[in-house]
């Protein structure tokens, strides 16, 4: 039976919790591009959205788990989402870029 996790990043621990989940065999995660979302109706008006899809993909790829996702293209989608909503999203990779992009620049 597949186990899934639904993680928010309110305290900055979503990636760490996803890492622990992956090591325990979790195979499905709820995530959002750029970390969209939140939970203001639950009494936390500054609650963060779900774990960022792009950060989850990066974690998987760095752990040797093939996702089949083009991370650079996904980061661009996150940047587009930020433009559409009209404010900065909490996702780190949409601002920093992927490790592969960094490695390509460093090797050039």
What are these regions (language model features)?
Residues 1-108:
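Catalytic cores and adjacent flexible loops of soluble metabolic enzymes
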């Amino acid at each position: 039976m597949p186990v899934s996790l639904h993680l928010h990043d309110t305290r900055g621990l979503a990636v760490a919790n996803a890492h622990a989940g992956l090591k325990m065999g979790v195979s499905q995660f709820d995530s959002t591009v750029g970390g969209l979302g939140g939970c203001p109706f639950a009494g936390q008006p500054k609650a963060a959205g779900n774990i960022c899809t792009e950060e989850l993909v990066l974690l998987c790829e760095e752990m040797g788990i093939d996702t089949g996702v083009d991370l650079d293209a996904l980061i661009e989608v996150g940047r587009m989402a930020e433009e559409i909503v009209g404010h900065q999203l909490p996702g780190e990779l949409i601002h920093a870029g992927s490790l592969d992009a960094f490695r390509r620049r460093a090797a050039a």
